[in-house]
């Protein structure tokens, strides 16, 4: 199976994940919880916002970490998750270096994200029409690449300082938020976002783009703007 066929099948599978009745969901409390799906050192976390109740459906943001990191490193989103009211799912890449498509091609990470989504649906009341896929650095590259191929599942894509864009297929038409520091030495803006954004707009995507004074790090003001863009 080539990567196009794999991702097309994955998009269909993600879109078809079952809806879990409220009575079937396990109890979950606000705060950070381990996923307990993967190996001890490569698993991930789910963050439940303050005030969470299963009586209503909540937006979901799947946030992907950068190279050599884990899902715990997306904790910069947790305070805003409390403020705006969103569940954060942060899986670990299967390889400790980075996400699969940046190494060999789509495969184990897509499968694990799918399993983590199913696990989250089992635990939380998620509003399926308000789901975003996002990340920073390599996580941004992966969310941008995978998000274009799973737009029927993720209606919004958030990419903080992406370095590559490698979609294997196109499904749906997600709205896209991209930001990049103009002095980024890791993923220089002139060969990344300044090329990606015009290309995406020419393909008909609704793209919000922000450049800011800074390097490769995530800035709080831009993260807040992304939350507002997605949730308000």
Regions found by a protein language model. Name each.
Residues 2-59, 105-108, 138, 194-198, ...:
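A domain-start/cap signature at the N-terminus of enzymes
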Residues 30, 37-50, 55-124:
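Serine-hydrolase catalytic machinery in alpha/beta-hydrolase-like enzymes
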Residues 66-70, 94-97, 137-140, 163-166, ...:
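Solvent-exposed loop/turn segments at secondary-structure junctions
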Residues 73, 77, 109-116, 142, ...:
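Stable alpha-helical elements in mature extracytoplasmic
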Residues 174-180:
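Catalytic His-Asp charge-relay segment
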Residues 179, 185-232:
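C-terminal catalytic histidine-bearing segment of alpha/beta-hydrolase fold enzymes
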């Amino acid at each position: 199976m080539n990567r196009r066929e794999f991702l097309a099948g994955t998009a269909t599978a993600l879109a078809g994940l079952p809806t879990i009745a409220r009575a079937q969901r396990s109890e979950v409390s606000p705060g950070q919880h381990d996923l307990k799906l993967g190996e001890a050192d490569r698993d991930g976390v789910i963050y439940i916002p303050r005030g969470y109740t299963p009586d209503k459906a909540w937006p979901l943001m799947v946030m992907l970490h950068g190279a050599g990191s884990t899902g715990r490193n997306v904790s910069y989103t947790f305070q805003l998750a409390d403020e705006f009211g969103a569940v954060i799912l942060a899986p670990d890449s299967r390889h400790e270096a980075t996400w699969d498509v940046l190494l060999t091609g789509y495969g184990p990470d897509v499968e694990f994200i799918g399993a983590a989504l199913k696990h989250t649906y089992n635990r939380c009341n998620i509003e399926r029409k308000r789901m975003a896929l996002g990340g920073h650095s390599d996580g941004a590259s992966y969310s941008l690449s995978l998000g274009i191929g799973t737009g029927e599942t993720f209606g919004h894509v958030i990419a903080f300082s992406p370095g590559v864009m490698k979609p294997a297929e196109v499904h749906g038409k997600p709205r896209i938020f991209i930001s990049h520091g103009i002095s980024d030495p890791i993923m220089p803006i002139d060969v990344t976002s300044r090329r990606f954004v015009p290309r995406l707009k020419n393909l008909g995507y609704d793209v919000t783009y922000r450049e800011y004074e800074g390097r490769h790090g995530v800035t709080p003001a831009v993260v807040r703007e992304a939350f507002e863009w997605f949730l308000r």
